[in-house]
Amino acid sequence: MKLPYLPPALFISLVLQAGPVRAATAEYEIEIRDHLFYPSELTIPSGVKVKLRVINTDETAEEFESFELNREKVIRGGKTGIVFIGPLKAGEYPFFGEFYPKTAQGKIIVVDDN
């Protein structure tokens, strides 16, 4: 089978329009309210990159921190921070608020989606 001739400019424009294929990023939200995380447990599927939107409704700053996730993010009062995590293996990944560690605690629960 013979392919039709495409002028180089047309060929290049078609290739550039196609662009790279990217996997969708799952999005979840956690709210900081009264120095607590809501929800305190968040279940996500394994093997997926996650965009975690952390909304701090308190007037004071808080830091989303997790040693297991290797993440730290200070979120000023009344602001929203974005934390990317994953892809992760099944398991539990605790996180806490560094400024109020006795109350601001939670965990990401990663489950196999099979």
Describe the role of every protein-language-model region:
Residues 40-59, 80-88, 94-96:
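Beta-strand cores of secreted/periplasmic/IMS beta-sandwich domains, seen most often
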